[in-house]
């Protein structure tokens, strides 16, 4: 439900601005992919699959640790070795694999953090929509709003979601 669904819908949506068809937004795209993983958990897909649940939790731990390492390197001036050591200690992954990750973060600041930031924004928007709409909240409609605008900055996504739930509240008055 992650990248494939998001990119397929973007390709099918003819009325998107050209910039959204041609330029990918990391926080939106990777955020949607991670959100899809969280959604699977929220819907109970791992309830009868303890190994799948462990994989999900390990993936979430890795994503969170990447955010810390990315921020540590670019905001707090961690050395390459500090970032590698942190990732190895936190995730249990091999030093060689974590060195490759750290090298990627070094040349693409913010990219690793964008996964978690994007997913959290989508989750926050879903929870806000649920609070505002109560029993009128429809998960499918929410996903349609998130996906129908194509890749865009998270601030624009938030505006679209707010416009959607406000219009639903206005219709029910």
Question: For the regions a protein language model found, what residue spans apply to each?
Answer:
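N-terminal maturation segment of proteins
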Residues: 1-173
